[in-house]
Amino acid sequence: MESPLGSDLARLVRIWRALIDHRLKPLKLTQTHWITLHNICQLPPEQSQIQLAKAIGIEQPSLVRTLDQLEEKSLIIRHTCLNDRRAKRIKLTDNARPVINEVNRVISITRNEIFNGISNEETIFLNKIISKLEKNIINLHNKN
């Protein structure tokens, strides 16, 4: 019987995030917090809440509570978009820099440790397969 690849990949992501979560405990950030901060850094500056929610893969209402909490921690500020008063733009504060640097450091170290013993060629091959799977899934979504 074949291994359920989707379940295997989901489990891999879950335990990978749990490891990072454990290592970031001293920062007193929940998994949702550090994932949100990490995604804010990956996007161009002052993205809208809608764009951030899409990048993370969640609905915007689900993101609002997390952003409220990050704002309470003085890690982000939100302001109304000049072009669309309904939209909110997200900006990192100066307080967020050291936190994000530590989050990114832990993520990078953890990734390197996880990939220990895996060659660069194997990593490139894995990335190609993941990209193909993602493309196929997106194409299937677009058909429906």
From Swiss-Prot:
Pfam families listed in its UniProt record: MarR
Swiss-Prot/TrEMBL keywords: Activator, DNA-binding, Repressor, Transcription, Transcription regulation
Record-level GO BP terms: response to stress
DNA-binding region as annotated in the record: 49-72
Family statement: Belongs to the SlyA family.
Chain ranges of the HTH marR-type domain: 2-135
Protein's name according to its UniProt entry: Transcriptional regulator SlyA
InterPro entries: HTH_MarR-typ (IPR000835), MarR/SlyA-like (IPR039422), Tscrpt_reg_MarR-type_CS (IPR023187), Tscrpt_reg_SlyA (IPR023071), WH-like_DNA-bd_sf (IPR036388), WH_DNA-bd_sf (IPR036390)
HAMAP family in the record: HTH_type_SlyA
Example of a GO MF term: DNA binding
Assembly notes: Homodimer.
Entry-linked SUPFAM superfamilies: Winged helix' DNA-binding domain
Function: Transcription regulator that can specifically activate or repress expression of target genes.
